[in-house]
């Protein structure tokens, strides 16, 4: 095998990054010879907004049952992409977030980065003027949040923030 294709016409960079991360972990586990639990990896993929999974075009001539003509909308009730890390203040331990969807103090979020993922509760939020606010209002805004101690983001240009729902 030389490549894997992530299907979908309208997948965001968040979707592609998260899917590639799960695929990489699954490939590494399979190649190492350890017990391979595909349900663990599918559970991680199920957290992403999707229209359900089918065999798609795995086979050359696909029966209609293997295509998804029913659900035209991706949905997810577990996680939501809420922002992109734009810079990190290492002295203070805070990150500047370009907000994509609303989140608030107390929310459980997952920081996805090239160095690995970290789950934590948002303890505080500051707006662009450094004023403490209860929530990041939504797309088009920038806020700062404190990072967990000893956070290693790898390359922060590729770090994203996801909120856990329910």
What are these regions (language model features)?
Residues 1-166:
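Surface-exposed amphipathic alpha-helical tracts and adjacent flexible/coil segments at the periphery
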